[in-house]
């Protein structure tokens, strides 16, 4: 059960580390051993600090994520909410996106909210105690994920074809693209798409989706935003014809039903977000950025 993972003490220590880091210029942090124990996945000053945890399947006890990789544990990446000043968290928003994504048929690892504030997702690089070989699109190709020249969905689809992944996974990638457009996940860069190598079959496959969420601050009004990955040479004002062009190029015959299914879950996302306790003003702000493909 989700209550079996207790992160309160870790969060308090992390807050202390963040405070010390904020006051430190050149002095070496004396919390280095702590950070190593909990395997903080981003810098402690990052906007969304992460830790790796392993939860015992038998009694719910937890250990740091680098201690036990056995099949007796569930292995999680946890995005911690350390901001007590807001009446919602970005982690709650990401969980609402997770619920909508999976309802739309997108393949993701099982995820949950811990104490209604921390987002925990099972790791796909550890399955039944086995380490899996994962590379991002950026890591496979050397493409700089910040460079617009390489950042396109067409490049991502072409890479998938080069890796000879099954056509069903090409269709899955298309579904993710449509979801990201409709639900305004603009931060869908090349590091947010990965591939898994299966050594037994000597083949590559598409990894489960991850980092699908609303990436902007819903409390701010943005006049114009652009996508990390272009579609049909466009980063803004993506329309139905742009999606059709991708569908034709990569033989996605069911594109119309995919679009319909994704768009039909906008109401579900709003209901889920409300049930999670996300304020209506935040739900309305995010929803205004959604794109209805016509």
Where are the predicted features?
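Phosphate/dinucleotide-binding and metal-coordinating scaffold of catalytic cores
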Residues: 1-190, 194-294
